[in-house]
């Protein structure tokens, strides 16, 4: 069976990152760690790769060195069932030096970008009623962390005044 596993390049802290991610996201675990050997480019005995699962999907963290950095061109989209999950994921993933950006985007302390998205948000901004959809979109565009009740209220208010 063919599989695809995203490989995330870290500068020596891939195990620490994987430990954070599996502690935050349900149904997640570290499945394997390999280590640099004596004749390899990294420090002998330090983690080379970390295989882990997030929400049951495979990932690899590679401690490749400082040559490459994460950018917002790649992000992990994390679906949140409700506002409590949005708040929890945002808090835990930005703890220790992460940043909160616009429209639910965050960057964790390792530089990896995430989109913390309430499950209801795509329905609101994709509503078949263009007035509701636009109001929801405009509300979201003015936010940092998504407040799903405020987005819902904006959509409802737009219909009430239309």
Residue ranges and their predicted role:
Residues 24, 54-57, 69-70, 74-113, ...:
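Vicinal oxygen chelate
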Residues 8-56:
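Core segments of cupin and vicinal oxygen chelate
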Residues 7, 54-55, 120-123, 130-133, ...:
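Conserved "turn/edge" positions that cap or connect secondary-structure elements
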Residues 128-162:
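C-terminal cap/linker of serine protease catalytic domains
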Residues 2, 40, 72-74, 162:
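A charge-rich, low-complexity, intrinsically flexible signal that marks solvent-exposed coils, linkers
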Residues 62-64:
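Active-site-proximal beta-strand/loop segments in catalytic clefts of secreted hydrolases
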